[in-house]
Amino acid sequence: AFVDMELPLPEGECMLAPRVEARLLQALQVQKTDKVLEIGAGSGYMAALLAHRAQRVISLEIKPALAQLARANLQKASITNAEVREADGAKDVSVDGPFDVIVLSGSVAEVPQVLLAQLKPGGRLAAIVGNEPMMRATFVTRTGETGYTTTQPWDTVAPRLSNFPEPSRFN
């Protein structure tokens, strides 16, 4: 049975609620030919869901214990087209790009330009953007070399991804 809540993980982290993961996945319309980048592997659950639909998944996880957990879970599930790398998703993203799909499995204050640059034309990015208590599911599609379209169809809240910049605030 599934519980629709943010399930706790080691190192004080938690998974996105399954309902949120399902809605992100549905909106991205991942295809069998897609190369996918996930930022924030966590338990490996989202990587497993993505791998079921995509050609290849690279999932970056900054915390060694979580990267190890995600690798073990993917191996237990006999998933061979998803790879978990110990890396900082806020910085180390250009190794295998560009990507058809990018998923941020956690929230950010804003979608970094460095990630948008890793989308192929026609590529899709999903993130939860904003600051508590107001965050929105955000979907960005690259329409050309410099063009992007963005939609924010629903409100949600998610834990912050590590090392992504916070907006400057006036004191």
Report the location of each language-model feature:
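Glycine-rich, flexible loop/turn motifs
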Residues: 3-5, 10-11, 95, 136, ...
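Conserved nucleotide-cofactor-binding alpha/beta core module
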Residues: 29-145
